[in-house]
Amino acid sequence: MADLSKYRNIGIFAHVDAGKTTTTERILKLTGQIHKTGEVHDGESTTDFMEQEAERGITIQSAAVSCFWNDHRFNVIDTPGHVDFTVEVYRSLKVLDGGVGVFCGSGGVEPQSETNWRYANDSKVARIIMVNKLDRLGADFYRVCKQVKDVLGANPLIMTLPIGTEDEFVGVVDLLSEKAYIWDDTGLPENYEVTDIPADMVEQAAEYRVKLIETALEVDEDMLMEFLEGEMVPTIEQIKACIRTGTRDMTFFPTYGASAFKNKGIQLILDAVVDYLPSPTDVNPQPLTDEEGTPNGEFAIVSADETFKALAFKITDDRFGTLTFVRIYSGTLKKGDTILNAATGKTERVGRMCEMQADDRNELTSAQAGDIIAIVGMKSNVQTGHTLCDPKHPIVLEAMVFPKPVISISVTPKDKGSTEKMGLAIGKMVAEDPTFKVETDIDSGETILSGMGELHLDIKVDILKRTYGVELEVGKPQVAYRETITTAIEDSYTHKKQSGGSGQFGKIDYRIKPGEPGSGFVFSSVVVGGNVPKEFFPAIEKGFKGMMDTGVLAGFPVLDVEIELYDGGFHAVDSSAVAFELAARGAFRQSIPKAGAQLIEPIMKVDVFTPDDHVGDVIGDLNRRRGMIGGQEAGVSGVRIKADVPLSEMFGYIGTLRTMTSGRGQFSMEFSHYMPCPNNVAEIVIAEVKAAKIAKDAARK
């Protein structure tokens, strides 16, 4: 079995265009996995292998690649930087042990890098930092380090200093070894020399080296005191051991300067992955849960000697067939083994499995704890987040949680052939992407696609058209409005029906009130005595909960309602579970209007970058879109504006922004929260929904 201490499962995270994919290309070149580096701007990068990725120059899927450096195995996942594809970041973080946060030397801490950093903190993933593109105009290593501290609240542990700035950036000073690494102008990563620190940087390097040592030794108080009192000078290995501890505890983040495009500084980052990021055995083991998702106090111990436990974290369908990407946490898996899908209860035999090199693969006969592999052609309806395990020792790993879609479009196939193709294609696409939802409008028969943003759905439609050959008519984007209540009330409802023989009877007395934001539906009972027998409580809860899907204002789902059953009545003969379920449904229809039904809309956290001379125009436009400006931050080449803006006001924003800023503005947005719609907006939305329903009804007659 392979030595798990020499495994590094890492992700590369950053904002769009900070250089994640280019960095991955350089890693693959240096580790011998590819012999010619492909460039993102040429559409030739190894990990951006989808047609849509190559065209748009962005990473959409998390591509997994394996390589070796200094006798250590790296499983590297290159993740998207665009906010519409954060599902890929979510699921990557679930299966990784460490990461490299890439920041643009001129752009600094940009919106999506901030979001990804927050996700990684939540997942407790240790990271090192790479300040990339130091050859760019306006690049400033020290300013980015300050932003990491001020904006992210993180402690960058500076490990290298850049030699030269912008187009004169030639290499770095390694503070630990007190040596300079200088590359020539050939652009080849192997063409560098290790030399003495340039004379004009000796004093600065000495100052930063002391800071590095003091910060590193803070994880070992005794050693720090001895160092500060002049009683000892720690060896490089002692310093590295402290850095390793502090990195894995996320006390600080080793920080390096580089230019991936110019092939400068990457080797030191690879060394840092080996030296400081955790192996699979260094991180906390994955918790196990019961079937309801509640932790049971047990864990998936990372060891090849344990029973097989793995998580399916990604499903793709490509020219090889269906690939199920799996992180093995415990045990071993051999070709021909039978495994259990804990979610479906089905077992199946593993026919083929492989190690992925972006869109190429190496066939495997076995894999072990710590490995990230792909199983080919699984048939047990495996979906993202499903647990795979030994049939004799069934377990459930902690589930993956994904954000809900906030935008929808309707699509209609143009002919019968496209209808059949679309049905097959959508089934595969839903399995691949948990934030992509599909449903059919009962009234119109239209297919409704829902996702995380305009680009997300644009890519999905493009895949349907070009990958699967589906001819489509696409409707306008629709906002995921919701309904809620604003007032607490007490009410009573009686369901009574008599039509010969036994009838139906159920009476419920209840309190209904607004719930906490994000609480969804909460039901409780404080009934004392036997006025409503306990056996009917589940039916009452089911009745209320079933009505949450369709609000009374415009038929949108209802959010954040608490209902407390406190009394009622029943009939010995006529009461039944069905009668009480119907009573709850009637009660919901009766009480929601009384409780101040209100339309609410999704609010997006919008981050806009604009050149200085267009700030006024951009802020004015955001205000016209009902935006609430949250702050401004001046940068080297422009201003970053933060605002909360209703999603309904953001359609087509990128075109407006480019026009206002002569093509130089950029923005990103992600869902933040729901807020009440202004009355004038609510009236328009409700009227449009009702008009559409009348039109559909008329079309059916």
From Swiss-Prot:
Main location: cytoplasm
UniProt GO cellular component terms: cytoplasm
Keywords: Cytoplasm, Elongation factor, GTP-binding, Nucleotide-binding, Protein biosynthesis
Family the entry assigns: Belongs to the TRAFAC class translation factor GTPase superfamily. Classic translation factor GTPase family. EF-G/EF-2 subfamily.
Gene3D superfamilies from the UniProt entry: 3.30.230.10, 3.30.70.240, Elongation Factor G (Translational Gtpase), domain 3 (3.30.70.870), P-loop containing nucleotide triphosphate hydrolases (3.40.50.300), Translation factors (2.40.30.10)
Name of the protein in question: Elongation factor G 1
Biological processes, Gene Ontology terms: ribosome disassembly
Subcellular location: Cytoplasm
Described function: Catalyzes the GTP-dependent ribosomal translocation step during translation elongation. During this step, the ribosome changes from the pre-translocational (PRE) to the post-translocational (POST) state as the newly formed A-site-bound peptidyl-tRNA and P-site-bound deacylated tRNA move to the P and E sites, respectively. Catalyzes the coordinated movement of the two tRNA molecules, the mRNA and conformational changes in the ribosome.
SMART domains in UniProt: EFG_C, EFG_IV
Domain (tr-type G): residue spans on this chain: 5-281
GO molecular function: GTP binding; GTPase activity; guanosine tetraphosphate binding; translation elongation factor activity
Gene: fusA1
Coiled coil stretches, renumbered: none
NCBIfam families: EF-G (TIGR00484), PRK12740.1-5 (NF009381), small_GTP (TIGR00231)
Native organism: Colwellia psychrerythraea (strain 34H / ATCC BAA-681)
